[in-house]
């Protein structure tokens, strides 16, 4: 997972009376982009007021540039989804002080950038994560999954892009938007790796789901928070405009110092009906003190290893009440650009397992399941298996309900194609289980093993998120053994909680409950 740290600038000139709350500096730890800001407006303003405010801000900017003979670009990205409205841009000190005083402005923060850290790349490790999802104990590499395989799901991978031509994606991956450069390629490998865990034919959880690349990181694994917000807004609006709500998922394997702007963008996507799977972070500290864990509503995922322990080696998984569930994230084999494969470790790899399982859940024919309740559903159907999860942290591990694991068995659907593409023959089944050739790890990504990762600042110093507090995660439940409802005859008997409508959005047992499962040999 990507988490960011850097150098902060002094904000002493931001002391205007009655101005919008400004993000506090973080004791010299942030890497701010000079003269770049993110502006959030109050939720109760109308769309017309938003447009008028942007015109006003542009006029203020133009007057200041003309008067002082300076060169600033002004408003860059803007967004308006539901009641979440704002913009980012490059402004002079005088202009941003004017903007902060405006009655419609709720929050202003400095844009920041950083570099990736806390994940490890190597070659030749076994792909154990899929097998763990469908078996009661670690060590089994057979992956049993329902044959719908996420065929109705649409997953937005907000990351460094996707190698959409990789044969493992079978034409199901497409480019959506690019907020970092003009090159629609994944030159950092991370996004393609995450996408492969979600939906590649050999390494993927949901082997038939559609994948949409939203690029917010450059070839050095860096990206401004304003690009994160713009990418989240684009994915939310794209899902709304194309009728994907109810089957749309966002994978967010990014993060860093706490940002109210990014947190609100994540929450807005979840409010819109998109399931958001977000990495908990790799600092071995409280996940709730940073972004994305500082956001409410979304599902925050920790990293477990192949022995069901919370990962505590290089880039140790974060912990705390804000971690909703654990998933495999250590030494995970998946796709990398150029048709190859490689292994990475981190909560970045854990979150895509949950995103893939959400795509399968979204593909259940006629279920009417609300993806907004998916995180609670996954937690309630999880296995209480994670050892030493950390203080005040759930021990729940993602499972899919096959082979006696506690969890739902899903239904059947057809493979999903990116919007505008016709279904092509021969894409209903995964290819050979052998990994593709060329298992080349990203250059320069082989840090010494078992080295302590840097911890995030103890005091992020951001303004509180005005739209809700992080909610506590599940407490350990040692008695939650799970497989008691698996029938020896090979059929499934649903658990007692199956028809609890208030907890799971009214999702009743569907007709296809006893459909056969497929077994994928790794």
From Swiss-Prot:
Catalytic residue list: 159, 190, 348
GO CC list: extracellular region
Annotated signal sequence range: 1-19
PROSITE patterns: SUBTILASE, SUBTILASE_ASP, SUBTILASE_HIS, SUBTILASE_SER
GO terms for biological process, alphabetical: proteolysis
Subcellular location: Secreted
GO molecular function: serine-type endopeptidase activity
Alphabetically ordered keywords of this record: Glycoprotein, Hydrolase, Protease, Secreted, Serine protease, Signal, Virulence, Zymogen
Biased composition (Pro residues): 432-459
Enzyme Commission number(s) from the entry: 3.4.21.-
Record field: compositional bias (Polar residues): 384-397
One Pfam assignment: Peptidase_S8
EC top class, as a word: hydrolase
InterPro entries (UniProt xref): PCSK9_ProteinaseK-like, Peptidase_S8/S53_dom, Peptidase_S8/S53_dom_sf, Peptidase_S8_Asp-AS, Peptidase_S8_His-AS, Peptidase_S8_Ser-AS, Peptidase_S8_subtilisin-like, Peptidase_S8_subtilisin-rel
Gene3D superfamilies named in the record: Peptidase S8 propeptide/proteinase inhibitor I9, Peptidase S8/S53 domain
Disordered: annotated segments: 384-515
Main localization (coarse): secreted
Keyword Electron transport found: no
Propeptide: 20-117
Glycan attachment positions: 251, 392, 403
Positions of the Inhibitor I9 domain: 36-113
Residue ranges constituting the Peptidase S8 domain according to the UniProt record: 127-405
Its job: Secreted subtilisin-like serine protease with keratinolytic activity that contributes to pathogenicity.
Family the UniProt entry places it in: Belongs to the peptidase S8 family.
Stated name of the protein: Subtilisin-like protease 10
Organism: Arthroderma benhamiae (strain ATCC MYA-4681 / CBS 112371)
Lineage summary: Eukaryota, Fungi, Dikarya, Ascomycota, Pezizomycotina
Name of encoding gene: SUB10
């Amino acid at each position: 997972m990507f988490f960011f740290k850097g150098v902060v600038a002094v904000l002493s000139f931001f002391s205007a009376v009655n101005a919008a709350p400004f993000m506090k500096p973080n004791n010299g730890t942030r890497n701010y982009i000079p003269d770049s800001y993110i502006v959030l407006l109050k939720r109760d303003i109308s769309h017309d007021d938003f447009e008028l405010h942007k015109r006003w801000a542009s006029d203020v900017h133009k007057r200041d540039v003309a008067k002082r003979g300076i060169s600033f670009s002004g408003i860059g990205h803007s967004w308006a989804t539901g009641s979440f409205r704002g913009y980012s841009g490059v402004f002079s000190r005088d202009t941003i002080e004017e903007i902060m005083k405006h009655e419609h402005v709720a929050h202003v923060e400095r844009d920041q950038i950083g570099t990736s850290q806390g994940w490890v790349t190597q070659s030749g490790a076994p792909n154990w994560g899929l097998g763990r999802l469908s078996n009661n104990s670690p060590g089994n590499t057979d992956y049993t999954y329902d044959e719908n395989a996420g065929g109705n799901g649409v997953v937005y991978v907000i990351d460094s892009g996707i190698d959409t031509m990789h044969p493992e994606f079978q034409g199901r991956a497409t480019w959506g938007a690019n907020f970092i450069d003009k090159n629609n390629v994944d030159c950092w490998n991370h996004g393609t790796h995450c996408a492969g865990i979600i939906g590649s034919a050999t390494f993927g959880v949901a082997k038939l789901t559609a994948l949409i690349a939203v690029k917010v990181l450059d070839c050095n694994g860096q990206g401004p928070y304003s690009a994160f917000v713009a990418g989240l807004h684009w994915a939310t609006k794209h899902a709304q405009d194309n009728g994907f709500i109810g089957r749309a998922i966002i994978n967010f394997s990014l993060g860093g110092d706490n940002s109210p702007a990014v947190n609100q963008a994540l929450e807005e996507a979840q409010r819109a009906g998109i399931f958001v799977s977000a990495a908990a972070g790799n600092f071995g500290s409280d996940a709730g003190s940073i972004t994305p864990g500082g956001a409410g509503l979304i599902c925050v995922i920790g990293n477990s290893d192949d022995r069901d322990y919370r990962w505590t080696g290089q880039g140790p998984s974060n912990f705390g009440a804000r971690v909703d569930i654990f998933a495999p994230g250590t030494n995970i084999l998946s796709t990398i650009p150029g048709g190859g494969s490689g292994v990475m470790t981190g909560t970045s790899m854990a979150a895509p397992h949950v995103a893939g399982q959400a795509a399968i859940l979204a593909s259940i024919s006629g279920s009417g399941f609300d993806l907004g309740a998916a995180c609670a559903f996954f937690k309630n159907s999880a296995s209480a298996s994670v050892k030493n999860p950390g203080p005040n942290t759930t021990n729940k591990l993602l499972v899919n309900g096959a082979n006696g694991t506690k969890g739902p068995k899903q239904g059947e659907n057809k493979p999903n194609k990116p919007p505008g593409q016709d279904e092509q023959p021969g894409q209903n089944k995964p290819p050979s289980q052998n990994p593709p050739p060329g298992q080349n790890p990203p250059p320069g990504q082989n840090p010494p093993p078992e080295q302590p990762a840097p911890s995030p600042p103890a005091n992020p110093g951001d303004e509180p998120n005005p739209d809700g507090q992080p909610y506590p995660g599940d407490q350990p439940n040692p008695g939650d053994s799970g497989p008691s409802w698996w029938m020896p005859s090979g059929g499934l008997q649903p658990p007692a909680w199956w028809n609890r409508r208030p907890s799971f959005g009214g999702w009743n047992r569907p007709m296809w409950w006893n459909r056969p499962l497929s077994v994928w040999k790794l």
